[in-house]
């Protein structure tokens, strides 16, 4: 595959891994009985969520590197690091949105639906190519949008962690 088709494969298929790795990070603590136990611990819940988030990012990077390495091994030609980082950022944006919605709504299903809806809006063309929320910009050679996606997804995670900490205080 050439650069354009490789970007299409990575951006339209592989980024879905982010949904499955990040959305369920808060699901174990969504029960009221479990929340009572968690909020009495000495370690803050937001620290546990941050650790889970970092671990899921590391696993995401390893999985995308492995998949991209197999693509190179099977004679696909593309800039490895640029495409891996772009794919990781898009997957992180999808997963971060789902994680944030899951935390804010206290429902894992809502997180999955938000991430799937965001992906479908991008796939159907409802999000324009020039938008800072466009997931598939690598195939068009626009990497600047990926920086906006990275900032947006990190901001959502930080706001969600602050929300978890404030919710504990209430």
Which ranges hold each PLM region?
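A cytosolic-side transmembrane-helix exit/cap motif
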Residues: 27-34, 100-106, 130-139
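Amphipathic alpha-helical segments used for helix-helix packing
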Residues: 36-38, 66-67
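Terminal transmembrane helical anchor/hairpin motif
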Residues: 108-170
């Amino acid at each position: 595959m050439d650069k354009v088709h490789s970007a299409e494969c990575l951006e339209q298929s592989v980024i879905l891994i982010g949904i499955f790795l990040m959305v369920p990070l808060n699901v174990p603590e969504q029960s009221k009985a479990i929340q009572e136990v968690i909020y009495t611990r000495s370690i803050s819940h937001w620290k546990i969520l941050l650790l889970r988030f970092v671990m899921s990012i590391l696993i995401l990077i390893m999985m995308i590197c492995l998949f991209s390495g197999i693509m190179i091994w099977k004679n696909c030609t593309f800039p490895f690091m640029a495409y891996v980082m772009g794919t990781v950022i898009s997957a992180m944006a999808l997963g971060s949105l789902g994680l944030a919605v899951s935390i804010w709504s206290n429902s894992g299903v809502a997180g999955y639906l938000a991430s799937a809806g965001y992906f479908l809006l991008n796939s159907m063309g409802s999000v324009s190519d020039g938008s800072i929320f466009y997931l598939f910009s690598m195939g068009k050679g626009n990497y600047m949008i990926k920086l906006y996606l990275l900032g947006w997804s990190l901001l959502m995670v930080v706001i969600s962690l602050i929300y978890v900490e404030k919710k504990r205080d209430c």
